[in-house]
Amino acid sequence: MPLPFEQFQGKGVLGFLDSSSSPGYKIWANPEKLHGRVEEDLCFVVNNGGFSEPTSVLDSVRSPSPFVSSSTTTLSSSHGGPSGGGAAAATFSGADGKCDQMGFEDLDGVLSGGSPGQEQSIFRLIMAGDVVDPGSEFVGFDIGSGSDPVIDNPNPLFGYGFPFQNAPEEEKFQISINPNPGFFSDPPSSPPAKRLNSGQPGSQHLQWVFPFSDPGHESHDPFLTPPKIAGEDQNDQDQSAVIIDQLFSAAAELTTNGGDNNPVLAQGILARLNHNLNNNNDDTNNNPKPPFHRAASYITEALHSLLQDSSLSPPSLSPPQNLIFRIAAYRAFSETSPFLQFVNFTANQTILESFEGFDRIHIVDFDIGYGGQWASLIQELAGKRNRSSSAPSLKITAFASPSTVSDEFELRFTEENLRSFAGETGVSFEIELLNMEILLNPTYWPLSLFRSSEKEAIAVNLPISSMVSGYLPLILRFLKQISPNVVVCSDRSCDRNNDAPFPNGVINALQYYTSLLESLDSGNLNNAEAATSIERFCVQPSIQKLLTNRYRWMERSPPWRSLFGQCGFTPVTLSQTAETQAEYLLQRNPMRGFHLEKRQSSSPSLVLCWQRKELVTVSAWKC
C-alpha cells in the first residue's frame, strides 16, 4: 500500500532505505572495505592492478553471465502481485554484497501523493512533457500509418503534481551534489595501456589505466590563447576577460606535467576567481547573477573538485530523496526549454521510420536516464496495436555505469516504471540493464545483444555526452558487430573539442553553458525554485561530468564524426517529417529565440539553436 509522503518528511533518507539502519549503505563508507578499490564509470582497478570481485549486480562483470537485470512485461503480466509488479531496487547487504529487494510501490506512492485507489504513476509525472493525449492532433510523428502525434500537449498527465513543491520551508530536504567520478581499468584482453594523468602529486596507490596506445600527442598546451567571450559593455568585457584568463590558467595548472606546486597554484587561482565572482555579483536585491558568471561559478566548482581529487575518496551517498528532486528538475527543464523534447522526439521519429515492417524492435540505449524518451515510443506502438490489432514487441537494452547506490536505485526505478507503463498500454516489453564494461572485451558480449531473427530491427541511441571519448572506438566496434538499422546521435558543441587541450575545453564549456543558461533565463520562470532546481540538478552535474571526463582522458582524439566514418558508418539524412515535427515543437514553446537549422554537410543533421548559438544536434547513421 502506498505510503503518504508526509511519513518520510524530515528523515535522512526514505524510510525503507534509511542509511542509519541499513548495513548495506555502510559498505560504501567503510574505509576497510573501500581500501584498495575504487569503482569506475566503466570498471575498477585495485592497488596491485588486478580485478576485484563484483559486490553488486552493477559491478564489473567477470563471468559469462554479465546481466545486470532482465525483465519482461506483456499484456498478461501481473503488476500488483509479487510475481509481476514487484520490481526491485537494489540495496547492498553488508555481509555478502548482494542486493536486497525493495518494492517500488512505496516510492510511487510517495512521489504521486495519491490515495491508494488513485492510479498515478511517477513515470507519468516524469514524462508529462513527452507523453501526450492520443486524441490530440498533429501532422508529425507519422511513418505512413496514420499514427497519432507524440508532442501535442493538452495533456491530462499535466494534471499531476509533485506534492513536495509547497512543503514547509523547515521540512525541505538539504541536497548536495555529490559527483562521483572514478577510474578506468584495462579489462582482460584489451588493447595496450595508455599514459596516465596521475592527478595530485603523491597519489601513488591508484593508477589510471587506459585501454589504448599513446598516439603521440601531448595532452595539452597551457600557453594557447583562450578564446574571448564579449560582454555587454567595456566593463563587462574586462571582467569576462579576467574570468576567462583565470579559468584557463587554473585548468592549465591542473594539467601541467611535473612540478609539485601546480595544484597549489591552481588552488590559489580558483580561490581568487571564486572571490571575484562572489564580490562582483551581489544578488542581495534578488537580482540573479548573469548567465556568464553562473556558468563560470559552476565550472570553478568543477575544477575545484578535480583539484581535490575527490575521485580518490570514498563515494558519498546520495539519499533516495535526491531522486525526487532530480525528477522535478528534469520535468521543469522539459517544460521550460525545448531542448529535451527536441532530442527525444527527433530521435524517436528516426527510430520509428527504421522499424517499419519489423515484428520485433530492439533499442540499445547508452543513456536511459529516467526512461522518458521511450514513453512516446511505447505509446506509439500501443496506438499501432489498437489500429491494426498487432504491433511489434519492444526490447530495450540499457548500458549503464553506476558508481553509487543511488545510481542503481535510479536504474531500478526507471526499469520498474517503464515496465509498468508498457503493461498499462498493452505493449509486449522487455528491458535488460547491462554494465557497460562488458563492451570492452568481446568475450563478454551476451548473445541477447545480437539480432535474433530477420524480423528484428535494432536501433541505437548514443548521446555523445554519455561517452568517454577514448572508449568510443570500442563502442563503435561493438555496434558494427550487431549491425543496427540506425544509430541516432545527439551532441553539443562542447562535446566536439576532444582534439583541443583541456584548458581550451574548459573555455568551450564556459561558452556553451553560458548560452544554455541564457536560453533558460529567456523563459522568465515565475518559479524561482524551479529555475534553481534546473541548474542544481541538471546543469551543474552536466558540467561536472563533462570536465571530469575530459580531465580523465587527456589524450587528444579525432572528432567523433571522423571516428564514425573510420569505423564504417555513413550519415543518414533525417526525414522531412522529423524536421516538420521539430519546427512545430518550437512553435508550441512559449520561449522565443529558439530556431532550427538543417545542415547538409558531411553528416546531415538537425540543430537546435538559441540566438544563433548551437545547443544540441541530432544526426543518424547506418553501417
UniProtKB/Swiss-Prot annotation:
First-listed, main subcellular location of the protein, grouped into a coarse class = nucleus
- Identify the stretch(es) annotated as SAW: 548-622
Name the tissues where it is expressed.
Answer: Expressed in seedlings, roots, leaves and flowers.
Where found, per UniProt? Nucleus
List, alphabetically, the GO terms of the cellular component aspect.
Answer: nucleus
Molecular function in Gene Ontology: DNA-binding transcription factor activity
Which region ranges are annotated with the description Leucine repeat II (LRII)?
413-448
Provide the GRAS domain boundaries.
Answer: 235-622
Leucine repeat I (LRI) as annotated region, ranges: 242-311
Which Pfam families does UniProt cross-reference here? GRAS
Q: Where is this region: VHIID?
A: 330-398
Could you tell me where the Low complexity compositional bias lies?
63-80
- UniProt keyword annotations, A-Z: Nucleus, Transcription, Transcription regulation
| Region span, Disordered | 62-90, 179-203
Q: Where is this region: PFYRE?
A: 458-545
Function statement: Probable transcription factor involved in plant development.
Similarity comment:
Belongs to the GRAS family.
What PANTHER family does its record include? OSJNBA0084A10.13 PROTEIN-RELATED
The molecule here is called Scarecrow-like protein 22
> What's the source species for this entry?
Arabidopsis thaliana (Mouse-ear cress)
Q: Which gene encodes it?
A: SCL22
